[in-house]
């Protein structure tokens, strides 16, 4: 990752932290940009700049980080509502449709985003695309005993699926739910995210896929302008 990209991530994470208010129940996302945001939230709480915040995390990694920083946490089942969720994305199209799941946390991420009154996505400018899936593969979480069958069904739908393998251990990536992840590429990208999200989730054995359709209320983008990193709110197409 380049130094410029790191600067963009930090700028947008700093902007995200400014969205939190006293007394909020907040969804804390996963990934590198979200981790910077969680650190910023912890710093503001420690400095007394925020109070009465309760966090709901979307991954084990985020839970550990938030706990280390002293952020009070509750499970999704223990809260009636989430005031604001902030998370990253792997790709964002002009209509604010997303691909998420590079960290294999998209099931919990989607649960938190759907529960939130407001969902803000934070990305650097490299994550903005005209069409989803031309660059980043679509993650699909599947039951371990059905991944071959599901791969075949995805192929019949025009998708080329491969089982995600772990890099620090032998064998496949295993999600927090104990499932496997198929990474899928559709020729020409994904023209209709809303239809495809439903079609994939209707395959028996699929728990959830990484298409986030009509969930994002705002997208904050980190950018470099004149050598200086800053964040801006993206204008939604249409």
From Swiss-Prot:
GO CC annotation: cytosol
Q: What is its EC number?
A: 5.3.1.6
Pathway(s) it belongs to: Carbohydrate degradation; pentose phosphate pathway; D-ribose 5-phosphate from D-ribulose 5-phosphate (non-oxidative stage): step 1/1
Question: What are the UniProt keywords, alphabetically?
Answer: Isomerase
Give the residues the record marks as binding substrate: 30-33, 87-90, 100-103, 127
Q: Which InterPro entries does this entry report, sorted A to Z?
A: NagB/RpiA_transferase-like (IPR037171), Ribose5P_isomerase_typA_subgr (IPR020672), Ribose5P_isomerase_type_A (IPR004788)
Q: Which GO terms describe its biological process?
A: D-ribose metabolic process; pentose-phosphate shunt, non-oxidative branch
Reactions performed catalytically? aldehydo-D-ribose 5-phosphate = D-ribulose 5-phosphate
CDD domains, sorted: RPI_A (cd01398)
| Annotated active site | 109 (proton acceptor)
Identify a single GO molecular function assigned to this protein: ribose-5-phosphate isomerase activity
Q: Which cysteines are joined by disulfide bonds?
A: none
NCBIfam families associated with the record: PRK00702.1, rpiA
Q: What does this protein do?
A: Catalyzes the reversible conversion of ribose-5-phosphate to ribulose 5-phosphate.
Its quaternary organisation is: Homodimer.
Entry similarity comment: Belongs to the ribose 5-phosphate isomerase family.
Identify this protein by name: Ribose-5-phosphate isomerase A
- Organism equals Synechococcus sp. (strain WH7803)
